[in-house]
Amino acid sequence: NVPENSRGPFPQQLVRIRSDKDNDIPIRYSITGVGADQPPMEVFNIDSMSGRMYVTRPMDREERASYHLRAHAVDMNGNKVENPIDLYIYVIDMNDNRPEFINQVYNGSVDEGSKPGTYVMTVTANDADDSTTANGMVRYRIVTQTPQSPSQNMFTINSETGDIVTVAAGLDREKVQQYTVIVQATDMEGNLNYGLSNTATAIITVTDVNDNPPEFTTSTFAGEVPENRIETVVANLTVMDRDQPHSPNWNAVYRIISGDPSGHFSVRTDPVTNEGMVTVVKAVDYELNRAFMLTI
């Protein structure tokens, strides 16, 4: 085993290979394989006389986690005196990589009025260190939430999966339309004293639901009806609706409940202003009807 990022000095001895016959005859040792005579070349070398094997430079586990070499022993004439042996060299991981979020900004949404426990989004960070050790085990936490309304803890995050869910009631789009949540990922199983960390931003948009009825701006509207004319707007009814403008939750639909038994009027919705346009659709005779009291 070789720890990565060793400071040396190099070359640094790893093992010594010896043949049982080296007391009887001179032996020459060599190694072959990736890291010796195959790229990357000469990461490892061996003293041909003593059999001492060395690493010549710092290792990087994230570049290569292990090496498989073969050691050979021959006599002075090049004749094999031992069968080649396999050498497996494993690079020991060090915590030298921070967790890296897949995205720096995540966008998610949640309906206003959602119950605690409602899923919002998932954030993910990867760590290049060994995931079977604490060096590569990432844990998540929420650092800040802006705004802190109606509570400073409107959301929580699963420390292992990165799933963000609501944890408190009170999401109201008409009060807070968007939250900015700073999320931190820390390796060493979330140990803030020893682990390496990184942060990302989660933008959570509170989506509108139809939780506000339209309200007339006044209880009485007045208008004048021209005699014997149709397709004329005689009154504009104004309403206020706190739901998201120009959404289905905001668009008003007007209906005449009473006061127009003969069907002289209809109320159409202005798609821009949401006003109700009281329109003459059947000609009115002044001599028969001098006034109408419509309930809408």
From Swiss-Prot:
GO terms for molecular function: calcium ion binding. Glycans are attached at N107, N236. GO terms for cellular component: plasma membrane. SMART domains: CA. Gene3D superfamilies: Cadherins (2.60.40.60). Residues 1-296 are extracellular. It is found in: Cell membrane. Three calcium ions are usually bound at the interface of each cadherin domain and rigidify the connections, imparting a strong curvature to the full-length ectodomain. This is Cadherin-4. It comes from Rattus norvegicus (Rat). The lineage of its organism: Eukaryota, Metazoa, Chordata, Craniata, Vertebrata. The gene is Cdh4.
